[in-house]
Each structure stands twice: as structure tokens, then as C-alpha cells.
């Protein structure tokens, strides 16, 4: 049974992903509600190391990009999957969403860079 790790799994899209993947996969959710701080990259990487799919959903400024690079480095050359969750906020950035949108754009660009290396 494939093992899927999802950050930000307790609400919104994260909760929907848990519901969907739980049908056929073992799901591990990481969020503040169960004591995980995605800013602690080492703790997250310990949970992700033995899984098959990592869904990088939770937002915390730089942490999503740092997690992408850390998991990619750990999994390089292995048959594993990383899914990064972006946002429509990156299109037509509104003032109140600028910090969020900028970090999601950074994640998107980091994703493209990692994809080019595969």
C-alpha cells in the first residue's frame, strides 16, 4: 500500500486530499494540529523519508520551498513523487495577498527548477 504524507491536512484542500488518498493509500498528515511545525525541516523529512508520495500543501513563507529542495535532495534517483500545491492567488496579485502569492510563485519556480533536473 503506497504511503502518502500531506502537510496542512486538517482543512481545505489538505483535508480533501486526505479523504481521497485514504481510499487506497496509507496517509500521514502533518500539521500544527498534530504537533508538526513545517518550519522544522528535519522533523518533516524524517516522516517523509519512507513514504512514496509527498504532498507539499501547508503554507509557511519559506518552508514550502525549503521542504521541496530537502525532499528532492533526499529522494534524488528514487521512484517517488512530490506534489506541490500552488494557488490561484498568483494570478492577478491583490494587495492583501501579496506575501502569500509571492511565496507561492517562488514554490512554483522552485518546482520548475527541480523538474528540469529529472
What is each stretch, according to the model?
Residues 6-7, 55-57, 81-87:
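Structural signature of the Rossmann-like NAD(P)-dependent dehydrogenase/reductase core
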Residues 53, 57-70, 102-103:
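Glycine-rich NAD(P)-binding loop of the Rossmann-fold in SDR/ketoreductase-type enzymes
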Residues 45-56, 80:
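A glycine-rich helix->loop->beta "capping" turn
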Residues 11, 59-61, 88:
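Flexible cofactor-recognition loop at the NAD(P)H-binding site
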Residues 4-20:
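N-terminal Rossmann NAD(P)H-binding glycine-rich loop of SDR-like oxidoreductase domains
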Residues 63, 76, 80-118:
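Catalytic loop of short-chain dehydrogenase/reductase
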Residues 26-46, 59-66:
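Adenosine-cofactor binding site in Rossmann-like domains, unifying the SAM/SAH pocket
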Residues 4-6, 24-32, 107:
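Short, hydrophobic beta-strand segments that form beta-sheet elements in well-ordered domains
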Amino acid at each position: 500500500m503506497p504511503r502518502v504524507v500531506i502537510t496542512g491536512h486538517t482543512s481545505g484542500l489538505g483535508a480533501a486530499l486526505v479523504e481521497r488518498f485514504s481510499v487506497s493509500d496509507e496517509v500521514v498528515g502533518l500539521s500544527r494540529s498534530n504537533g508538526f511545525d513545517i518550519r522544522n525541516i528535519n522533523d518533516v523529512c524524517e516522516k517523509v523519508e519512507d513514504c512514496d508520495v509527498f504532498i507539499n500543501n501547508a503554507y509557511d513563507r519559506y518552508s514550502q520551498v525549503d521542504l521541496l529542495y530537502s525532499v528532492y535532495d533526499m529522494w534524488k534517483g528514487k521512484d517517488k513523487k512530490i506534489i506541490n500545491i500552488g494557488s490561484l492567488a498568483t494570478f492577478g496579485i491583490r494587495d492583501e495577498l501579496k506575501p502569500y502569492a509571492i511565496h507561492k510563485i517562488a514554490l512554483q519556480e522552485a518546482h520548475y527548477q527541480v523538474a528540469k533536473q529529472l
